[in-house]
Amino acid sequence: MAKSKFERTKPHVNIGTIGHVDHGKTSLTAAITKYFGEFKAYDQIDAAPEERARGITISTAHVEYETEKRHYAHVDCPGHADYVKNMITGAAQMDGAILVVSAADGPMPQTREHILLARQVGVPAIVVFLNKVDQVDDAELLELVELEIRELLSKYDFPGDDIPIVKGSALAALEDKDKSIGEDAVRLLMSEVDNYIPTPERPIDQPFLLPIEDVFSISGRGTVVTGRVERGVIKVGEEIEIIGIRPTSKTTVTGVEMFRKLLDQGQAGDNIGALLRGVDREGIERGQVLAKPGSVTPHTRFKAEAYILTKDEGGRHTPFFTNYRPQFYFRTTDVTGIVTLPEGIEMVMPGDNVAMDVSLIVPIAMEEKLRFAIREGGRTVGAGIVSKIIE
């Protein structure tokens, strides 16, 4: 069968189901595909393939579907550890999340942890599906559970009072039972997702940024840097800043090449060579970035959320403590940093996820939500995301 062309007519949004184990994330995912996509049964989604992101193996199921308004790519993970890894590494980017909570149990430890992670990694918006409502006869009890969910969301700085909560039963939807809590609830959920989760700004519309991968000089022409444009557009003749590792400097892009052809501009996703005016080959290096002036700044100290690999995943065999000094791999280069653990946390074991403060020995062009790998001698031992810049 011929592969159908990916229709680019609708806005595209990346989404995922989050929540406590056995609250119905995978059943809900299956139910959504039943009405909005090519139906995928529970077992097809649950048998998620393994993939590698930043040196870490993660099991993630990807499904796609569309509403009248949008096209969605949806991720669902089989295990709690996979969620933690997925959210921290950004293996599957999430523009929004559907938090699934069982009405019979209410919020549980992983409900809390996934909300906290969503906050730390910058998931912009959450919509709630209160599942298994057919297991609760008492309307007052349902109200209490809803209140509890709203309070929990507010506690982690989501607008708990405004977040849509849809009540239903994923199982009823899958089994074509009680339509009001089955099919109708799933359709209502997707209309809330359509309206409440904002359409992300496309990379091409964001300010220009290119992480430098390589630098060389061309006799008679000057210095060329190569790399993949991460976001935005660069036109010949535009002024840019060179940021990170050394003091920030300004230059002008005098040429853009792709596949040995000269272009007027390079844009998000393009692998380009950029010719820079008046820059010495020695004055620029891999690990710096080219960026639109004023759009991003260099920093050395930040708070991060990180996942530390287990021994079986190829990570450390032993715990680490405050003053641990690994390399932090940002975009294209390793920078040594010193770790400070939060008060009350003595050590971090392989397999833990942890909040920590990091102080780099040289500044890197940085913003919140920037992801990194933690490495020791070129071997990945963890992954993290900048949750807050300190200085």
Curated annotation (Swiss-Prot):
**Annotated binding of Mg(2+), by residue:** 26
Its recorded reaction(s) are: GTP + H2O = GDP + phosphate + H(+)
CDD domains cross-referenced by the UniProt entry: EF_Tu (cd01884), EFTU_II (cd03697), EFTU_III (cd03707)
The subcellular location is: Cytoplasm
Which Pfam family, any one of them, does this sequence belong to? GTP_EFTU
Task: Region G3: list its residue ranges.
Answer: 76-79
Q: In this protein, which residues make up the domain named tr-type G? A: 10-201
Catalytic EC class = hydrolase
The EC number(s) attached to this protein equal 3.6.5.3
Cellular component, GO, one term: cytosol
Region G1: start-end pairs: 19-26
- Alphabetically ordered keywords of this record: Cytoplasm, Elongation factor, GTP-binding, Hydrolase, Magnesium, Metal-binding, Nucleotide-binding, Protein biosynthesis
Fetch the Gene3D superfamilies from UniProt.
P-loop containing nucleotide triphosphate hydrolases (3.40.50.300), Translation factors (2.40.30.10)
Location of the region described as G2 in the Swiss-Prot/TrEMBL record: 55-59
Specify where the region named G4 lies, as residue ranges: 131-134
Q: Which domain of life is it from?
A: Bacteria
Self-association or partners: how does it assemble? Monomer.
Q: What does the protein in this record do?
A: GTP hydrolase that promotes the GTP-dependent binding of aminoacyl-tRNA to the A-site of ribosomes during protein biosynthesis.
HAMAP family in the record, alphabetically?
EF_Tu_B
* Family of the protein in this entry: Belongs to the TRAFAC class translation factor GTPase superfamily. Classic translation factor GTPase family. EF-Tu/EF-1A subfamily.
UniProt-listed PANTHER family: ELONGATION FACTOR TU, MITOCHONDRIAL (PTHR43721:SF22), ELONGATION FACTOR TU-RELATED (PTHR43721)
Protein name listed in UniProt: Elongation factor Tu 2
